[in-house]
Design a protein with these regions (language model features):
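Bacterial N-terminal signal peptides that target proteins for export
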Residues: 1-11
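C-terminal segment of classical bacterial N-terminal signal peptides
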Residues: 15-25
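Low-complexity, acidic Ser/Thr/Pro-rich repeat tracts that form intrinsically disordered stalk/linker regions
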Residues: 25-40
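Short, T/G/N/S-enriched strand-turn elements that build extracellular solenoid repeat scaffolds
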Residues: 40-42, 93-94, 149, 192, ...
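Structural signature of tandem-repeat unit edges
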Residues: 49-57, 76-89, 99-112, 122-135, ...
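Extended Gly/Ser/Thr-rich low-complexity repeat segments
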Residues: 58-77
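Consensus positions within tandem repeat domains that build extended binding/scaffold surfaces
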Residues: 91-94, 115-117, 137-140, 158-161, ...
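Short, surface-exposed terminal/edge motifs of secreted or surface/virion proteins that either
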Residues: 320-325
Length: 341
């Protein structure tokens, strides 16, 4: 038994030697590399900080795991990335799935963040926005922890670029081209404001967010398909005069209790305010002020409550009631009342 203990002790010491000889954290190294002719990088293993020094456009990592781009070797360690001045665009997929990344520092002069650049960086919560930034391409900040970011001066937001992010509020710029589902599934998003002049709310723009109320400005002409679909905390929506088209499923499966359709509306899309659950819709009151609705989708207010009241222009009561009763699945007890606006 004593001999066995001695053997185990020797084995233990042999295994312990590498640990005893290991360099302390205070002697952590700085690793360096180069990519293409215009980019150098360094990684400090003590601070877990990556510094990118690039002149012009950063190379794309379209494979997402291109180890020729040496900084990718530290995707599971890097906590902070600093870009030095001189870079004009961040490459596609450049920091895809950097699992520990928490902070990004961007310089003035940066114009474009290309697609998937920070996609999957689920711990990323701190980032500044340079005044020169114009374009954020698709999927850039998918599922990150960022709570707020300025969108001022942006010219384009790519599809799903903030999908699943932890944003709490956004201010939508008037002159920015906004592609599909930009804020889809941002469950923490409660507040949205629009700069004067916004003309369109795009497809799925706020789908499945935590918005509780929304005021759509008169400059908006079209509310896109699925724009506010499945926003189950949305209890109040003001659609101002100026809106012409409310698209398919624009407000389907929300918690709206009443809604007013302004006089400028000419198109109501299929399922625009439909509740598709087995439970009845929350809508109790609908006011239709428009006398010029030319296109009606089916089931605009489908699966309604039995106490729903829809107010329509008196001059259009017969026409609108026929459409609503025949194509919209109103409860038998729902009332349609003519009003002289």
């Amino acid at each position: 038994m004593t001999k066995m203990k001695t053997i185990f002790a020797v084995i233990f010491l042999v295994l312990l030697i590498p640990v005893l000889l290991k360099a302390p954290e205070s002697e952590a190294k700085v690793y360096r590399g180069k990519c293409k002719s215009n980019l150098t990088w360094s990684y400090d293993s003590k601070t877990k900080t990556m510094v990118i020094d690039c002149k012009g456009d950063m190379p794309d990592d379209e494979q997402f795991y291109d180890l020729d781009m040496g900084w990718r070797k530290y995707y599971f360690k890097t906590k902070k990335v600093i870009f030095k001045k001189g870079i004009s665009s961040i490459g596609a997929g450049a920091f895809y799935n950097f699992q520990k990344l928490e902070e990004v520092v961007l310089p003035e002069g940066l114009r474009i963040i290309k697609y998937d650049a920070f996609d999957g960086c689920r711990k990323l919560q701190f980032i500044n926005k340079p005044s020169t930034l114009e374009v954020i391409e698709k999927d850039v900040f998918w599922d990150v922890k960022i709570k707020s970011i300025s969108l001022k001066n942006l010219k384009k937001l790519g599809s799903e670029c903030f999908s699943g992010a932890k944003l709490q509020s956004v201010d939508i710029p008037a002159k920015c081209k906004i592609e599909d589902s930009v804020f889809w599934n941002c469950k923490k998003l409660k507040k949205v404001t629009f700069e004067k002049g916004v003309k369109r709310i795009s497809y799925g723009m706020f789908r499945e967010t935590g918005i509780k109320n929304i005021d759509i400005p008169r400059s908006v002409a079209q509310i896109g398909t699925y724009a506010f679909a499945n926003c189950q905390s949305l209890k109040k929506a003001i659609i101002n005069e100026g809106v012409k088209k409310i698209s398919k499923d624009a407000f389907s499966n929300t918690a709206l209790e009443e809604i007013t359709i302004p006089s400028t509306v000419t198109q109501l899309g299929k399922n625009a305010f439909r509740w598709e659950s087995t439970e009845k819709s929350s809508l109790k009151k609908v006011v239709i002020r428009s006398q010029n609705i030319k296109k009606w989708g089916t089931m605009v207010f489908g699966a309604t409550r039995d106490d729903l009241v829809i107010y329509v222009p008196q001059s259009k009561k017969a026409e609108y009631e026929k459409i609503l009763r025949s194509t919209n699945g109103l409860d038998f007890h729902a009332k349609i009342v003519g009003k002289n606006w």
